[in-house]
C-alpha cells in the first residue's frame, strides 16, 4: 500500500516504518483496541495449558471471546495455530470467564457467552499467499488483519476479506475436514443463513434495502451476525433482521437524534431488541425505501 500526503497539489510518498518487534504491534493494538476493533481488552499474555495467548478480548456485540495473535514474519501456519487456540477456548471455557470477571466490573456467566461466535484474529504487517488461501473459507472463524506504520505516525489497518467464491469447510478433503471438526461448536454466519426458508418476496425486499444502504456510502461493509445483518462504516449504522413476513431495521442513533418527520421509526430505547440503536422500523414493502435511506444516512458519521 502506498500512502501520500498532499500539499498545494503536490504529493509526497510516506515511507513505511517497519515494526522492529511483534511486541510493538501488540502494544499498539492493546492500547487502542476499542478504537481499532470495538472489542473490550481483557488480558495480555493470557496463559492456559502450556499456551500463551497474546491478547484476549471480548466482543460486546456478539457476546463472544476473541483471541488476537501478532506476527511480524510470514513463515507460520495461522490455520493450525488458530484452530489450536479455538480448541483451547472451547475446552477451558470457565478459565476465560474467570479471567473476564477478574478484569471487568460487570460479571459474566457461562450462559452469557455465545461460544458459537468465538474467533481468532492474526495481526501482521503482511500475510503471504499461502496464509491467505489457507484461511479462505466462509465458515472458518479465523481472520487476517494487516497493520502498517508510515512516516508522520500514520497507521493503516486492512482487514483481508474472504473472497466471494470462498468454499465452505465441507468442500475440503476428508483429512482436512477432520482437522476442522473441532470447530463444530462454532458457527460463522452468512447472509444465506438468514435468507433460508424465506419467501422470494422477503428475499427481494431485503435485497432492495441492502442495496439502498450500500449505495449510501462506498465504505459501508456487511457483517453477518447470528440474529441480524449489520451494515458498518467504522461502527454499525443499521442492522436488519430478516423475518418470515417482514424486515426489522434498527438505526444506530440515540433516541432524540433522528430527524423523522413521518414518524416511521419506533423508539425502542427502553425495550429489548437485537440490533444497535434506539430506533426500529418494521418493513413490509418498498413504499418508503428512499425515505428510510434518508433516515439511515443520518447515522453515518463523516
UniProtKB/Swiss-Prot annotation:
GO terms for molecular function: nucleic acid binding. It comes from the Bacteria. InterPro entries: DUF5655 (IPR043714), tRNA_endonuc-like_dom_sf (IPR011856). This is Uncharacterized protein HI_1375. It comes from Haemophilus influenzae (strain ATCC 51907 / DSM 11121 / KW20 / Rd).
